[in-house]
Amino acid sequence: MSSSFKRKIASVNVRVASPEVIRNWSNGEVKKAETINYRTFKPERDGLFCERIFGPVKDYECACGKYSGKKYEGTVCEKCGVKVESKDARRRRFGHIELAAPVTHVWYLKNSPSVIATLLDMTVKDIETIVYFGSRRVNERVVIVTDPKNTPFIKGSILNQTEYEIYAQKWDFEVSPAYIVKEPRSPLVSDIDGEVHIKHEKTHTDRELYWIVVKNISRTELKVYTGMVLNFKDNDQVNQGDEIVSEKRVEAIFAPFDGTVEVDEISETITINPLPTSKNNPITFSLPYGVRALVKNNEKVKKGQQLTTETILNSIVAPVSGTIRYSKQLNLRPLENGLYEVLTNGVIYIENVQNIKQYPVFEGAPIQVEDGQMVKAGDILADRFLFEEEKLTIEEYKLFSEYYPGMFVVEEQIENDKPIMVITDIDPSVSEETGIKKGQVITQQDYEAYSRIYPGKIEAETGAMAIKKLLEKIDLEVMKAEIEAELKKIPKSSVRAKKLLKKMKIVKDLIDSQTKPEWMVLEALPVVPPEIRPMIQIDGGRFATTDLNDLYRRVIMRNNRLKKLLEMNAPEVIVRNEKRMLQEAVDNLIFNGKIGKAYVDRNGRQLKSLTDLIRGKKGRFRRNLLGKRVDYSGRAVIVVGPHLKIHECGLPKKMALELFEPFVIAELSKEENTEAPQTKVKKYRKELQREDPKAWEKLEKVIQGRVVLLNRAPTLHRMSIQAFEPKLIEGNAIQLHPLVCPPFNADFDGDQMAVHLPLSPAAQAEARLLMLSRYNIISPAHGKPISMPGKDIVAGVYYLTMVDKNYDKIEPENIKWKFANPEEAELAYEFGFIKLHEPIIIKINDKAIKTTFGRVIFNSILPEELRDYNKTFGKNGIKDVVYKTFKTHGIDRTADLLDSIKDLGFHYATISGLTISLKDFMISPKKNEIITNAMKKIEYIEKLYDDGLLSDEEKYKETIKIWTETTNLVQEETYRYLGENPFNPVYIMVDSGARGNKDQLKQLSGMRGLMADPSGRTIEIPIISNFREGLSVLEFFISTHGARKGSADTALRTSSAGYLTRRLVDVVQSVVVTEPDCGTHEGVRATLLKSSDNFVVEKIEDFIFGRVLAKDIYEPGTGNILVNPNTNKSYTRDTVILDEDAKFLSNYKKRVNVVEESILDLSVGNIPEVYAELAEDIDTPSGLIPSETEIDWDVVRKLRDAGIKNVKIKLYPIVGSVISEEIVWDKDRKKQIAVEEEQVDVALAKLLEENNIDSVYVRPEIYVRSVLTCESEHGVCAKCYGLDLSNHKVVTVGESVGIIAAQSIGEPGTQLTMRTFHTGGIATTADITQGLPRVEELFEARKKTKDPEGIFSKVKGTVVDISNDEPKKIYIQDELGGIHEYEVPSRVRVNVTVGQKVLPGQSLTSGSLKVRKILEELGPEETATYLLKEIKRVYVQQGVDIHDKHFELIIRQMLNKAEVIDSGDTEFLPGDLVPISLLNKVNREIMEGNAKVEMNRKKIIGRELAKHIIVKNEDGEIVELAAEGEEVTEELLEKLIEYGIKEVVIMNHDKEKEVYQILPKETVKYRRRLLRITQASLEYEGWLSAASFQQTQQVLTDAAIKGAVDYLKGLKENVIVGQLIPAGTGFDIFSSVQYEETPRLAKEEKEKFA
C-alpha cells in the first residue's frame, strides 16, 4: 500500500458568465414555480425539482420507473424524459430560468464602487431608478399655450418648462406662464340676497367661463287688468309720473245669437251656448276689470240682449322711476303697434337695483342655481369656482384674484414625480444641437418632446433593457484610448483623474478577462442543483424548504406573469410594474435586502439569498470549505491518566472498536475467503455489534503501531491537536496524560476531547513523526517547554525537595546520619531511621554532600550533570531543569524525565497529605502597625489639603501612592510571616508555584488594598480587611465593582481574542518558508527594546536568540571578529545564535578608548581595522590632504605616490560599536552626550573626545536576519526566519511559519485583559490602554487611538528648552545645530528633560504615537520597531512570552505593500496597493526593457502586427494608426513613436504573438504603506482566500470583473479546493515522496519507546 502527494488543481479562475455560458450549464429550463406534488410527493415536471432537468431522485431509476438499475445507465426514458443515472447528478446539474425581460445583477450595480455606474459615468442612484422604473421628483414652472400658430398644440395646452424649452428650440408658438391653484375655498356662496342671472363666455385660452350675477332689487308692484294696453315693454326705463297704461273705455257685451248663458264667477267669464237647432258655436267672453254681468246663470237670452255693464279702465301712472318688469305669470297679446294687451289680470313691477354681485366660475365647476332664481345671502351658487391644481394664465389669474381676493393661493412651480429614462441612442447631429449625450438621464415627458421634434433620431429606454443597450454599445478599446488621452491632459492628483483611473482599471480588467459589459445584465438566470436547496418532509406531512426555493419561486411566478402580460399586449404601466417586480425578485434571490425591502418569511425572519449562503461564519466558505467534518472521529469526556506515558492516551474500548471498525473487519476477513465480500462485511459488522471476543483480539492487533489524534476545542494553536498511541481501557472516558494539559488548556472538570484516526500510511507517518505528544513538549511560540507539570505534581516535588527552616544552621559535623551511597540511604528510609526532610551526609561521586533523602530521590531521575542536591525544586526549578535537559539531551530524554517527574510528584503529593484549613491562613501581627503608619501619613496629607497646599488631583495621587506602598508592605510581611513555617500548606502551594500567588495570599491573609470603580479609576478608600477577617459592608460594596467588571471582561475577551486570531491567521496564512536562503545582506539591528516610560520590553538576549547573523560581529576596539571564549565559536555572518550565544553576546561589554594616536607605516600594506583619520594636513603634489580625512586605500595610494613613508593618525576604536553605559554626560554635566543603545558614529566619537571622555563601555553592533528584511518573492527564507523554536533547529523549508506566528500571538489573547487601567498616577506612564484593545489598535493601525496622541522626535539631538506657555513646546537641537520645535498636545505630559539626548522615533511625551506618522517621517524600519515594541509590551505586562519573529511576520505583512503614486508605464493604477517585491521586480524589468529599445525597433521592421493600434488624435477623434496584419515599415514605426506607442504586438515566424517595446518606459513611483491586518488580508493576491475572509461579495465581484486566476499559493485556497496545502509535507519538494507501509511487528514499535 503506497501513497504519494500530488496537487491536481493548479489554479482557479472566476469570471462573469455570459448568457450563453449560463444556458450551457443548464440541463433545461425551469418553467413552473411548483416543487413537489403534494399527493405523490414526486417532483413536478418543469418545476424547481424536476427530474428531467436535474436528474433522478432514486439511484439509476427514471421518474416513471420504466428503467431501473445500473445496467440502464445513460438511457433517456422516452416516457418521462429522465436520464437514468446516479442521484448524485442532483448535486451538480443546473437548470435555468429564461427571463422575460433583462435584469441587472445586483453585485455589479450595488458594489462599491459600482461597476456598471463607473462604466456608464452615471450615478448609482440614477441607474437604480432606471432599473426599477422609478421616477424623479421635479420642481418646475408650467406654461399654457395661448397662441399655437403652426404647431400641433391647441390653445390651452399645458407644458412643463423643460418641455416648453425643448419645443421652443424648434417651433414658434406663444405661451403664458401658468399659476397653479392651491386650496380654493369651496363651495361658492352668495354674499347678498337677490336674483340670479347666468352668462357664459370663453377665455383667451378657449376655456369656458361662467358668470353668476346676483342682483339685490327693490320692487313696486302695479296690478294690471284684462284689456289694458301696456305703453312700456319689459326692461324699459320709466320715470316717475309716466303713464304706463292709458285710460280706456270698455263697451258693454251684447248676445250675438239666441241661446243660454253660463256665468262663471271664478274665472270671470260669460259663455253663450247656442240653441240645439242653431249652427252657431258657443262663445266665451272674458269680463274686463269693473264690468258686471247683467244676466244670471242658465238664463236664456235673445240675440242683441245686453249681457254686461260698460265701464272705464283708469290709467296707471309710474309712482317711482325704475325698470319695468313683467311678471312671469302675466298673459299678454302683442298688438300691431308694438304694444301689449293684457289678457289676464296680473302684475307688473318697477324695479330698482340696490346691489349687484358677479361670480366668475371656471369650466367644469358644477353650478347649483338657475337663471332668475332668487337666492338668500349664504346660499350655495356653485360647488367651487376653481379646481385644486387648476392652471391659469396671468390674465385668468388676475381675473380670479380680482373677484376672489384671499380665497385661494397659487404656486408658480409644480412638484411632480416624473418617470425617467436613459438615452440609449441619439443622432450625432441632434446630440450636437441639443447637448444631450448617450447615457444621459431625462424624464419621460422630455423624451416625448424630443421624439416629436426629432422623430426617429433619438431613442430612450427605461429598465434593465436600457442599461443592457448602453453596455452593449461600449467599445472597451475605444474607451481605453479615450481615457488614456484625457489622462495625459489633466494633473494626476485631480479628482477627475482619480475617477478616470478607477474606470480605467475596470476597462482594463474587462478587456483582459474578455468579458463583455452587457453580461452584467442577466438574460438567463441559473438555478442551482436541487440537492443544494433541499426540501425535507417533516411531521404532519408538511415540507420544510430552503429559503432559496421561496426566492426562486417568486422569480418564476413573476417571470411567468410578465410573459403572459407581454403576450396579451397589456398596458405599458402594468408591464413596467411587473418588470420592476421581476427585477426585485432576482435582486433578492442574489442578495436579499441589498436594494429595497428584504423578503421575510411569516415569522419576520429575513430569507437567505445566494450571497448569504456564501458569506459570513455560516456561509459556504467558512462553514463547508474551510471547516469540514471529519470521518473516523469520536468525542468523549476526558479523565486523568496518571499511569500513562507522555505519548499515550487511554481510549475506551467501545470507541476504539467503532473507530477502527474497517481495520478490524479487514483483519477478520483475512482468516476466511469464502463468501461474497458484501455479505461478509455484514456478518462481521454483526460480530462487532455483538462484541465478539474475536473482535477484541483483532482490535488489539490492529491498534498496535497506530496513533490517534486528540483535539480539544477551542483549537487555538497547533498544540491543540496532538498524536498519541492509544491504550485500550474500560469505561467511556478518554484518559489523558496530565502533563499535556497545558498545551491543550484542558482540565478534568467535564472537558471533552475529540479523537481522530489518520487512515493512510502517509497520514500515520506524519502524525507519528511530527505530531506525537512527546515531540511537542517545546512551544513554537517561545521555545520553552509547554508540556509541564503543574498543581499536585509540583507540590509533590516541592515537598520532596524542601527542607526544615533550621536546615542551613545545622553544621555537617552535627549531622547524625552519613551514608556511603544513595542505596544505603534508601534502606535507612525504608526502615524508618531517617525522614524525607532530615539532613544527611551522603557520598556522591567521591564527594560528601549535605542534603536530604528527598533531594536524593528527586536528583536520581535527573541527568547527572544537571543534579543539584541543595535546591528546593518549585515550578520554575522544574521548568529550568526540563529545558536544560532538552538543550543537552534532546527531546526523547526530556519526555522520559517528564514522565519520571510526574510519577514522583503524584507519589509524594499523596504522601505529603497536603490539605489546607482556615487556620493555615495566618495573619501577621505587624499588619496593624503598618496600617496605623499609613493612616498617619494620610492624616498629614488631609491636613495639607485642608490648608490649601494640595490640589484635588495631588491629594488623590498622594493618597493612592501611600496605600499602594502600604499594600505592598503588608503583602511582603504576610508572605514572610507565613514562610516562617515552611511546612504551612498554604505557603507550600504558593512558594512551589503549584497554586495561587502572593497577590491572592495578600487578599486572604493581608489586606485587599485599593479597588477600581466602574470607570476603572482607583477608589481612594482601600480595603484594609482580608478575607480571613471578613469585610465590612462598605468594603464589600467597594469590591463589587471590580468583580462585576472582571466577569464582563472575560465574556468580551473571548470573542475579541477569537476574532483577532482569525484576522491574524488570514493575514499571514500564506507565509511559508519557501527557500533555505534568500541571499539578502540586510538585517535588523539588535537593540534593547524599551518603551517610552523606560519599561524594558525585551532584553538583547531574547532579541537575538534563535536568529541568524546578518553581518559579522566585530570586537569593539580591535576590529577583529568576535569569538566566544567558552565555546570558541566565531560570530560571522550566517551563524545561528543559540541560547548560550545570546547570553554571551548580551552580557559582553568592554571599556574602549575613545581616541588613540598612532603612526601609520605606509610601507606595510595594511590600513587600520578601526576607523582612522589623518591627524594633520599633508601636502602632496596632487594637492592638500586636510587633517580629519578618513584613511582608506585611496588616501594611502595618494600618500605613497607622494613618497611619504609614515603619517600621524588618530584612531577611533569606538566607532561602529554601541554605547553600553546608561548615560555619558558632558564635562559640565548639563547635557547628555551619549545614551544607552546609541550607535557610535564619527560625530559622536569626536563629541566624546571634545568633552575629554577617554573611554566608555560599549558592546559590539549586532545585525541579525529578520523576516522584515527577507527578500524571498513568496513566503520567507529559512535563514531570515532562524530557529524553529519547537525543536531549536533551523526551520525547514515548507514550514507554515505564518500560521504558527498567528497562533502564537492569538492563543494567549484570552489572557490579555480588556481593561483600560487608570492607575491614578502611581505608574510613571499615563493611563495607557492595555490588553487586547491596545493590541488590536496597533494591528489595525487605528487612525484614532483611545489614548491621546503623543509626539516623537524626528531627529537625533538634545533637548535644549521646554517652554511651559500654552501650548507647551519642546525644542531639540540636532547634531548640526539646527533647532526643531515640537508642539505638545494638551492631553499629554512631557517625558523628557532639558539636556536629555533623544534618538529618532523616541517618544517626547506620554500618549501613544500614530504609527502612520512614524512611517511617513522615519520609514519602515522605525515603524516596525515601534509596532514590535508596543505590541510585545502588552504581552510582557501580562506575563506572556512570545518570540519577536512571530510579531515580525505580522508586521512584515502590514508593511509588505506600497501604494503606487505614479504608475509610469505599467499596468498598475495610482492608488493600487502592490507588494514591494513585485514593484521592485517590475522596475528592474522596465530598466532592462529600456536597454533593448533600439534593438527592438530594428527587429520589428518588416514584421506583421498581431493587433490593431487605435489612438485619439489632436482633434479628439479615435483613429486607427495601423490595422491588424499590417507590415511595420520605417514610416509606420516613426508614426507609432510620434504618437507615443510604447509596445506593439508582432506575429513571429511561428505565427505566435510577441510583445516588443519600442519606446523607453517610465518606472513605477510608490510610497510605503502600512496596512491594517484586515485590509492586508483583503489585499491578498489570491481571491479565494480574500473572499473567504470578509466582504465576500465585494471580493468576488472584483475578481470576476478581472477574470482573476488564483494560483493557490496560500494554505487557505488549497483547503477550499480540497487538496494538500503547500506547506509541511505538502510542500513541493516533498510532493514526490512515496510512503510504503511494511508489515512491522508491534513489538519493534514498542521497543522504540521502551
UniProtKB/Swiss-Prot annotation:
CDD domains: RNAP_beta'_C, RNAP_beta'_N
Catalytic activities: RNA(n) + a ribonucleoside 5'-triphosphate = RNA(n+1) + diphosphate
First-level EC class: transferase
Enzyme Commission number: 2.7.7.6
Cofactor binding, note field: Binds 1 Mg(2+) ion per subunit.
Keyword terms, alphabetized: DNA-directed RNA polymerase, Magnesium, Metal-binding, Nucleotidyltransferase, Transcription, Transferase, Zinc
Chain sites annotated for binding Zn(2+) 1: 62, 64, 77, 80
GO annotation, cellular component aspect: DNA-directed RNA polymerase complex
Swiss-Prot/TrEMBL GO biological process terms: DNA-templated transcription
Cofactor: Mg(2+); Zn(2+)
Binding site for Mg(2+): 747, 749, 751
Binding residue positions for Zn(2+) 2: 1078, 1270, 1277, 1280
Gene Ontology molecular function terms on file: DNA binding; DNA-directed RNA polymerase activity; magnesium ion binding; zinc ion binding
Purpose of the protein: DNA-dependent RNA polymerase catalyzes the transcription of DNA into RNA using the four ribonucleoside triphosphates as substrates.
Subunit record text: The RNAP catalytic core consists of 2 alpha, 1 beta, 1 beta' and 1 omega subunit. When a sigma factor is associated with the core the holoenzyme is formed, which can initiate transcription.
Family: Belongs to the RNA polymerase beta' chain family.
Protein name per the record: DNA-directed RNA polymerase subunit beta'
Species annotation: Fervidobacterium nodosum (strain ATCC 35602 / DSM 5306 / Rt17-B1)
Lineage: Bacteria, Thermotogati, Thermotogota, Thermotogae, Thermotogales
